[in-house]
Amino acid sequence: MSHVDDGFRSLTLKRFPQTDDVNPLLAWEAADEYLLQQLDETEIRGPVLILNDTFGALSCALAEHSPYSIGDSYLSELGTRENLRHNGIAESSVTFLDSTADYPQAPGVVLIKVPKTLALLEQQLRALRKVVTAQTRIIAGAKARDIHTSTLELFEKVLGPTTTTLAWKKARLINCTFSHPQLADAPQTLSWKLEDTGWTIHNHANVFSRTGLDIGARFFMQHLPENLDGEIVDLGCGNGVIGLSLLAKNPQANVVFVDESPMAVDSSRLNVETNLPEAFERCEFMINNALSGVEPFRFNAVFCNPPFHQKHALTDNIAWEMFHHARRCLKINGELYIVANRHLDYFHKLKKIFGNCATIATNNKFVILKAVKQGHRR
């Protein structure tokens, strides 16, 4: 369990999913404390917008102001809701919005946890540009090492004059004043042609490897099985290229695209609509924490390129959760296929969970593994 004391209240916070006790990761960071310190003497007038509040430290601390929590992570929303409940704060105190939603007009305060990707930051700053005023207090925070010249230039370009604070506990803040600088329009998605197909892949701002096909997915696509039927899953679908390939290779199968990022799920939907419209009726699109709440014994196969980081933190907790959810939701003799970096040693992890694991293909960087749900394992 992680604790944070600040000028607003004392909170008990935990990550979501929880990390193990051997290598615990905190549910808050110095940048959260630093941001809250800046508001100690501030009279807040107008809506409070909080962007990219990973586990709800800011939302819980500012709950009395009925903030809007804006981001592109269903896991973050679940974590924030859990921490609100755990601290005896009504979940209704916080309004949750996707990054692509319309933001409330004329906010009094905007707090931004600087995201990992500049593309997401730019999308969010452009959305803020439509609603903030010169009187809106705009403060962003991150580890000092994660604030670069390009970060500051982006604030200047989209919103206006920008300054930084001194570092405190290895965190730094960005202060910005809206001045309505001239700014050219930008497309909502980035698109590129997928090699060896006639497909155009559309990517929202927060989609993994949005500028081109990542090498792990390329390797995975070379070894996807054919002649599958029933329901199969692209788990952690991103822009949906794996699911698209499965749709094309398996005309008797229905594909469920699942991701915790609303932008990823929307990108997958858009890519099916524009590239395989005739297959759209064979698709389901789901924003979810892996396969939480999905009935057991439903799927014939699950395909997964699991992440090994959550925001800036390295962790295999999400991958572990995906593997356990896959086993629960697979039919007997159903198969889980994954692609992963070789150094992660998922072979032994899958063998521990499923009781078996086979190597389908390998190269100098990646490995494709298959585990089968056996009848005697519940």
Curated annotation (Swiss-Prot):
The reaction(s) this protein catalyses: guanosine(1835) in 23S rRNA + S-adenosyl-L-methionine = N(2)-methylguanosine(1835) in 23S rRNA + S-adenosyl-L-homocysteine + H(+)
An MF annotation (GO) of this entry: nucleic acid binding
Predominant place of localization: cytoplasm
EC number(s) reported in the record: 2.1.1.174
Keywords: Cytoplasm, Methyltransferase, rRNA processing, S-adenosyl-L-methionine, Transferase
Subcellular location: Cytoplasm
CDD domains tied to this protein: AdoMet_MTases
InterPro entries tied to this protein: DNA_methylase_N6_adenine_CS (IPR002052), rRNA_m2G-MeTrfase_RlmG (IPR017237), RsmC/RlmG (IPR046977), SAM-dependent_MTases_sf (IPR029063), Small_mtfrase_dom (IPR007848)
Keyword match Cytoplasm: yes
Pfam entry (one): MTS
A cellular component term, taken from the record's GO annotations: cytoplasm
Keyword field contains Cytoplasm: yes
Database matches in NCBIfam families: PRK15001.1 (NF011577)
Function comment: Specifically methylates the guanine in position 1835 (m2G1835) of 23S rRNA.
Assigned protein family: Belongs to the methyltransferase superfamily. RlmG family.
Protein name listed in UniProt: Ribosomal RNA large subunit methyltransferase G
Organism: Salmonella dublin (strain CT_02021853)
Gene (name only): rlmG
